[in-house]
Amino acid sequence: MLKFIDSGGGPLIMLERDLLPCWGGIFNIGGVANPHRNRVPFEAPNDYDRACEIRSWIAPLHVSNRAGVLFWGDDPYLALVRQGDATFFAVRPYYEIENLQDHIEFAKENPNCFTKDFEASISSSQLIVFDSASPGWDIRGGRLEIDALPGIYEVSTYWQKIPDAEVVFHKFNLRQGR
């Protein structure tokens, strides 16, 4: 059974655990040294606004001295699925699909369906996906976590739109020859 993130919408962001304090959400850019500082939500500029400016299915977003991965859109459905040690998928169905697992298996078995978007460097092993409006030090709503091997990942996308399903798959594949 897939576990989907519990979110009021998006965009969603995936950060390495040690970058969480560097994400300010609706409060500011770059997190804060003291999370109890008196900040007004949506007071510009803020990290959430930076996230909302991106207009592609998936994109890197600079956070501190590295990059997070942004999942664009207001659709809150996203699950993480592992395929071995070096590959995982973000699965984004756009409505309830009875046979979603069959679509996931199709995506796993057909790597040529994917188009490369960018490369992402992961230096620590734990990744957290959450609503980009939340500050990293106080994530509201749901979150998803997945362990990943450190290294450079090729990030690619496959949009499957057929009569009974519309699903976007983002594949994170660790480059060989790390």
Model segments located where?
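Extracellular and analogous surface-interaction loops
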Residues: 79-82, 145-149
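Primarily secretory-pathway and cell-envelope proteins
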Residues: 1-112, 118, 164-178
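Generic recognition of long tandem-repeat/solenoid scaffolds
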Residues: 89-91, 128-130, 146
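Hydrophobic/aromatic beta-strand elements that line small-molecule binding cavities or substrate pockets
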Residues: 143-146, 172
